């Protein structure tokens, strides 16, 4: 049976989720029946079809005041500010993909349930949610009774697969992560007022240190790592693709060869973890659907101190995981 999805918020992630559904292997199992966004339908259709990062959408796209038509499929569109007023019940929505960045707490996301949706999957770290999921790492924790779930962040989705392997095989005692992260829409092209003084500065002109909860969130995904990891972000002037730089102290001495072997073996057959030995740079991973691509070229070891790096397309990889997690949530059993 096809799972009926609605997308709330048609920004970078919302649009890429829809693109991934139509250009990937998801259409036989998933159907987007509705999109709610406060923007004009004509503008949203144009932005969906033409993308500065991911190129032209390969299929036919049409629109009218009440719908977006993608490759012959009609998707109802609305512009309703209060999620509790959305027509999810009449549209038979099984799962809402909450992509606005606004309704990330359990209380706020519950408005979708009031509107008649079966479940909610949040495209961001969530507060007081029933589960935080990194597909390919802990999605087996999902249960049919879970109704409001977080898909974590793009950075946690990159970090968790690598940390899982290192902890399982070597025993992480503690560690620090830096994500060297592409700029995003919560920054500004030029200097402008922002309560975070770092993010008040031009995204295109500086490397900008800022905070992230991605490392701590790994403890929600892998409870055995709770309290062992922390980190920060450095936003850099590239439009897409980011890099996790992880340094951990492990329980025993190891070597570059062993660390690389462990990650290579873990990547074989993994739906989310890749392994790279080529001399590649960030642009080479643009539009890569994997969550985390470990780069064996940059592994460093000093006794029990290990540095590992992994690339991730912070838009496309995460958008694909939203669909994978939606499938896992729909299939979950108690």
From Swiss-Prot:
* Top-level taxon: Bacteria
**Pathway(s) per entry:** Carbohydrate degradation; glycolysis; pyruvate from D-glyceraldehyde 3-phosphate: step 1/5
- Per UniProt, which keywords does this protein have? Cytoplasm, Glycolysis, NAD, Nucleotide-binding, Oxidoreductase
Instruction: Give the UniProt subcellular location, in the record's own words.
Output: Cytoplasm
Q: What Gene3D superfamilies is this protein classified in? A: Dihydrodipicolinate Reductase, domain 2, NAD(P)-binding Rossmann-like Domain
- Enzyme class of the recorded protein, top EC level: oxidoreductase
Q: Does the keyword Protein biosynthesis apply?
A: no
Pfam families per UniProt? Gp_dh_C, Gp_dh_N
**Annotated positions binding NAD(+):** 12-13, 37, 81, 123, 185, 314
| Record-annotated site: Activates thiol group during catalysis | 181
Q: Where does D-glyceraldehyde 3-phosphate bind?
A: 153-155, 184, 199, 212-213, 235
- Extract the GO molecular function terms from the UniProt entry: glyceraldehyde-3-phosphate dehydrogenase (NAD+) (phosphorylating) activity; NAD binding; NADP binding
Supply the EC number(s): 1.2.1.12
Which terms under GO biological process does the entry name?
Answer: glucose metabolic process; glycolytic process
Task: Name the catalytic site residues.
Answer: 154 (nucleophile)
**Which GO CC terms are listed, alphabetically?**
cytosol
What is catalyzed by this enzyme? D-glyceraldehyde 3-phosphate + phosphate + NAD(+) = (2R)-3-phospho-glyceroyl phosphate + NADH + H(+)
Assembly, in brief, is: Homotetramer.
Looking up PANTHER family in the UniProt record yields: GLYCERALDEHYDE-3-PHOSPHATE DEHYDROGENASE 2
Which family is it part of? Answer: Belongs to the glyceraldehyde-3-phosphate dehydrogenase family.
Role description: Catalyzes the oxidative phosphorylation of glyceraldehyde 3-phosphate (G3P) to 1,3-bisphosphoglycerate (BPG) using the cofactor NAD. The first reaction step involves the formation of a hemiacetal intermediate between G3P and a cysteine residue, and this hemiacetal intermediate is then oxidized to a thioester, with concomitant reduction of NAD to NADH. The reduced NADH is then exchanged with the second NAD, and the thioester is attacked by a nucleophilic inorganic phosphate to produce BPG.
Quote the NCBIfam families the UniProt record gives.
Answer: GAPDH-I
Name of protein: Glyceraldehyde-3-phosphate dehydrogenase
Q: Which organism is it from?
A: Pseudomonas aeruginosa (strain ATCC 15692 / DSM 22644 / CIP 104116 / JCM 14847 / LMG 12228 / 1C / PRS 101 / PAO1)
């Amino acid at each position: 049976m096809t799972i009926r999805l609605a997308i709330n918020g048609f920004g970078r992630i919302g649009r890429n989720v829809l693109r991934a559904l139509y250009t990937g292997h998801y259409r036989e199992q998933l159907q987007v029946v509705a999109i709610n966004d406060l923007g004009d339908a004509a503008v949203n259709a144009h932005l969906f079809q033409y993308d500065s990062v991911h190129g032209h959408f390969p299929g036919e796209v049409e629109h009218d005041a009440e719908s977006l038509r993608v490759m012959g499929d009609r998707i109802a569109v609305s512009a309703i500010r209060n999620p509790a007023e959305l027509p999810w019940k009449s549209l038979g929505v099984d799962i809402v993909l909450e992509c606005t960045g606004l309704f990330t707490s359990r209380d706020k996301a519950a408005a979708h349930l009031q509107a008649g949706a079966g479940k909610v999957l949040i495209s961001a770290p969530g507060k007081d949610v029933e589960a935080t999921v990194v597909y390919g790492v802990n999605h087996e924790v999902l249960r049919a009774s879970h109704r409001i779930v977080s898909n974590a962040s793009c950075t946690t989705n990159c970090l968790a697969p690598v940390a899982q392997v290192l902890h399982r095989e070597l025993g992480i005692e503690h560690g620090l992560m830096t994500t060297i992260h592409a700029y995003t829409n919560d920054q500004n092209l030029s200097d402008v007022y922002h309560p975070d003084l770092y993010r008040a500065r031009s995204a295109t002109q500086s490397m900008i240190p800022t905070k992230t909860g991605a490392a701590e969130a790994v403890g929600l995904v892998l409870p055995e790592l709770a309290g062992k990891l922390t980190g920060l972000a450095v936003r850099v002037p590239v439009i897409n693709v980011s890099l996790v730089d992880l340094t951990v102290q492990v329980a025993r001495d190891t070597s570059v060869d062993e660390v690389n072997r462990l990650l290579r073996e873990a990547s074989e057959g993994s739906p989310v973890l890749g392994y790279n030995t080529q001399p590649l740079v960030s642009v080479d991973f643009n539009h890569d659907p994997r969550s985390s691509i470990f780069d064996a070229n940059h592994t460093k070891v000093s006794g029990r101190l290990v540095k590992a790096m992994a690339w991730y397309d912070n838009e496309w990889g995460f958008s694909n995981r939203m669909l994978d997690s939606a499938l896992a949530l729909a299939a979950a059993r108690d």
